[in-house]
Amino acid sequence: MVNIRPDEISNIIRQQIDNYDQEVQVANIGTVLQVGDGIARVYGLDEVMAGELLQFEDKEQTVGIALNLESDNVGVVLMGDGRNILEGSSVKSTGKIAQIPVGDEFLGRVVNPLAKPIDAKGTPSVQDTRLIESYAPGIIGRQSVCEPLQTGITAIDSMIPIGRGQRELIIGDRQTGKTTVALDTIINQKGQDVVCVYVAIGQKASSVAQVVSTLEEKGALEYTIVVAANADEPATLQYIAPYTGAALAEYFMYKGKATLVIYDDLTKQAQAYRQMSLLLRRPPGREAYPGDVFYLHSRLLERAAKLNQDLGGGSMTALPIIETQAGDVSAYIPTNVISITDGQIFLSGDLFNSGIRPAINVGISVSRVGSAAQIKAMKQVAGKLKLELAQFAELEAFSQFASDLDKATQNQLARGQRLREILKQAQNSPIPVEEQTAIIYAGINGYLDEVELSQVKDFVLALREDLRNSKPEFGESILSTKKLNPDSEEILKKAISDVAQAFSL
């Protein structure tokens, strides 16, 4: 029989007690009551925050956001398809609000709304993170918009100028060139030290691929980040995509850089949010949108700002895009976003179909801020342009009914047609501001009145080429002084007369 030694046993027990790890892990765990349509109802999560990330225990480790905090359950929107989440499975609260990695390494990359690369170029090694939803800068942290953001589109830079830190809405029906205006603006930032973020919401993957290849072709991808929430992705990802874009831009803005964010388009984000809200059984309002759809967009667009020098003087310019139905700008989402932004560029389907591209309706397009940032040279030449075009449009409508017109009216019509012609522009070919100044100067001062309408385009191209190759001092003077001084005006007149001679006018 084996002798039992009590002292040995007591030593072993004492050792076990000494080595016992007393650390207790407390987790807030709930149970899935119901799941479907990208929504889960969870019971038992008593201490969850609004907007907190929740971890589901399925094969994909699906993450959700707690949006509805009700008395007996929590409504969770899923950031995945959630096909393997079962009724009765457990859910753990993470104690974190949605955040993403940020850094310079994201430049030139295509990422999803969780900032995970989807371009097969590897995972960027970044240390910094930012909350997807963060507070907009306060009044004291801002300064007035004081620098121009050149789009390279003559009609916009002359009549609807955009400044750094402004929110300018691009609005119009489908297929009127809204994305083209935004892409031209990105392409024109080459060499301007502006970081661009293009957010594609609910678009076809083929459309996003086309945008990326255009940017790559024009050498613009190196300073651009593309955030893509494609049409086949869950509504939750389409809803958070714009906030991800804003967070990526904010990282650069707070480092003192100028940034440009394009949200293409916020109509689809509002529709994704409406879908989520209706599935969560939130009460519907006008057009079945939830009551806080205004706040959805205002909290996003208020993050665009021109920071004061104490905060580094960085800026975030926002160009949200809204798609209208049959030109109806008085629908719910368009009126909301018009009231939040500092102006709008309205693109008209009728103008587009009649060959005027970019199809900007100058009558109802406006910039409420940017003119303060417009360079003086452009103000000097383009001051009368909007009025001239408005008078021309009125006369043109009248002349369709009048049989005989006096000479002055005929001259005004001829000039108006030429002004409209010089504002036409091919896509993906932005024009530098000094050349825009020269083109408008020639049009507004009647130098194109004798040129045949069919030759105006060639005349403008020849003038730009002459200034670029034979008279580079004109461009240098405009860029350095920001004014059209008498010397540069003489150079410009000489260039116009040289080109006119070549056209034997």
Curated annotation (Swiss-Prot):
Entry binding sites for ATP: G172, D173, R174, Q175, T176, G177, K178, T179
InterPro entries hit by this protein: ATP_synth_asu-like_sf (IPR023366), ATP_synth_asu_C (IPR000793), ATP_synth_asu_C_sf (IPR038376), ATP_synth_F1_a_nt-bd_dom (IPR033732), ATP_synth_F1_asu (IPR005294), ATPase_a/bsu_AS (IPR020003), ATPase_F1/V1/A1_a/bsu_N (IPR004100), ATPase_F1/V1/A1_a/bsu_N_sf (IPR036121)
Pfam family, one: ATP-synt_ab_N
Swiss-Prot/TrEMBL site (Required for activity) positions: S365
E.C. designation(s): 7.1.2.2
Keyword DNA-binding among record annotations: no
Domain of life: Eukaryota
A GO cellular component annotation in the UniProt record: proton-transporting ATP synthase complex
Membrane topology: Peripheral membrane protein
SUPFAM superfamilies associated with the record: C-terminal domain of alpha and beta subunits of F1 ATP synthase, N-terminal domain of alpha and beta subunits of F1 ATP synthase, P-loop containing nucleoside triphosphate hydrolases
Keyword annotations from UniProtKB, A to Z: ATP synthesis, ATP-binding, CF(1), Chloroplast, Hydrogen ion transport, Ion transport, Membrane, Nucleotide-binding, Plastid, Thylakoid, Translocase, Transport
PANTHER family, per the entry: ATP SYNTHASE SUBUNIT ALPHA, MITOCHONDRIAL
Function per UniProt: Produces ATP from ADP in the presence of a proton gradient across the membrane. The alpha chain is a regulatory subunit.
Similarity annotation: Belongs to the ATPase alpha/beta chains family.
Quaternary structure and interacting proteins, as annotated: F-type ATPases have 2 components, CF(1) - the catalytic core - and CF(0) - the membrane proton channel. CF(1) has five subunits: alpha(3), beta(3), gamma(1), delta(1), epsilon(1). CF(0) has four main subunits: a, b, b' and c.
Protein name per its UniProtKB record: ATP synthase subunit alpha, chloroplastic
Name of the gene encoding the protein in the UniProt record: atpA
